[in-house]
Amino acid sequence: MEAYREACGLNPDVVFLQNHGVIVTAARGEECLALHEEVNARIRNYLCITAPYPAADEFITAMRAHRPEYIEHFLYTPLFPDQVVYGERVPETVAAALYIRYHIEERGWRLSMIPADLAAALVQMESEKHRQQAQF
């Protein structure tokens, strides 16, 4: 980010963090949402994903039926911090992890998982303990 700031004189509006996802910023909430949608659309276009993002519950049910190993994998090998913090309590988190894994494996790419020691450290962080208490 520092190199970008030095070269361009401002912070980037979009930042990708491995195992975290995309961070998008804008002056107003509507602009931020629109930019986030644009980023997601470009990613889907690049990956030739034509189907709309699935409803969480329906996608989880389909994965349980057709790819049960994904559910097992979800529980023990997280892709991103929200998966560690919220686990199965938030269907959107489960669906996102399964969706990402499905599309990565369909292309023959390797998954980059959060190592067990880092996942364990995450749940001990004060900020994450606070997020664990969130009600959905």
Regions found by a protein language model. Name each.
Residues M1-F136:
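Glycine-rich flexible loops
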